[in-house]
């Protein structure tokens, strides 16, 4: 069939992963709601749904890597699809984070009488922005420089240098996640402490979750680079990871200025 096709597009074979992913997502959602409302079996259904969903993600991406790396189905025309999809996904994530920052700004610019008409609310402790938050802020942009180094190394065909750069990126990402964990451990307030706690932990936690996802993405890229999967002309997966990581490291500046610094004084 491949030999007879006269176009540059990849006609994928029938796959069970879309339906299995849908079932895993359904079980995760229903199980999560049941667990939050203390229904019997909610935790079990949630755990099974997550396991099924993670397994589906693993085997589905495994098949995509086989089709692109080993079978050569990802032509230039096919590569445009993942590129456009990655860009649109990042745009949707920007809108997500914009909503959280909007909520924080709205609450701080017009504090209600229920919280004393001041921001931060009366009686709520806040983190000192000039300690761990300030120390943590330049780490992600530094990791962004390291991932750019890796990209240039791939384009130059220097495989070992690309691996070293990706290792440096991942290490900086882990340090950043560790610092954020220290922030939360030392935080004088919780997510249930008024609108300040809700917006603070939701915005910073959502960004921290993106850092973890991006770190996993880069770890996979590092393994693939070590195995020789990425070449000068075929490294769309790495490009998507690099774009995502630049989004993550730039966004870090916004919570520091609007939440830690301006919103916490």
Curated annotation (Swiss-Prot):
Principal place of residence: mitochondrion
An example Gene Ontology molecular-function term: cytochrome-c oxidase activity
Top-level taxon in the UniProt lineage: Eukaryota
InterPro entries the UniProt entry points to: Cyt_c/ubiquinol_Oxase_su3, Cyt_c_oxase_su3_dom, Cyt_c_oxidase-like_su3, Cyt_c_oxidase_su3-like_sf, Cyt_c_oxidase_su3_a-hlx
Any single GO BP term: mitochondrial electron transport, cytochrome c to oxygen
Entry EC number(s): 7.1.1.9
Compartments reported by the entry: Mitochondrion inner membrane
Membrane protein topology class: Multi-pass membrane protein
Catalytic activity reported: 4 Fe(II)-[cytochrome c] + O2 + 8 H(+)(in) = 4 Fe(III)-[cytochrome c] + 2 H2O + 4 H(+)(out)
Gene Ontology CC terms, in alphabetical order: mitochondrial inner membrane; mitochondrion
Annotated keywords: Membrane, Mitochondrion, Mitochondrion inner membrane, Translocase, Transmembrane, Transmembrane helix
Gene3D superfamilies associated with the record: 1.10.287.70, Cytochrome c oxidase, subunit III, four-helix bundle
Family recorded in the similarity comment: Belongs to the cytochrome c oxidase subunit 3 family.
Known function: Component of the cytochrome c oxidase, the last enzyme in the mitochondrial electron transport chain which drives oxidative phosphorylation. The respiratory chain contains 3 multisubunit complexes succinate dehydrogenase (complex II, CII), ubiquinol-cytochrome c oxidoreductase (cytochrome b-c1 complex, complex III, CIII) and cytochrome c oxidase (complex IV, CIV), that cooperate to transfer electrons derived from NADH and succinate to molecular oxygen, creating an electrochemical gradient over the inner membrane that drives transmembrane transport and the ATP synthase.
Name the UniProt record assigns to this protein: Cytochrome c oxidase subunit 3
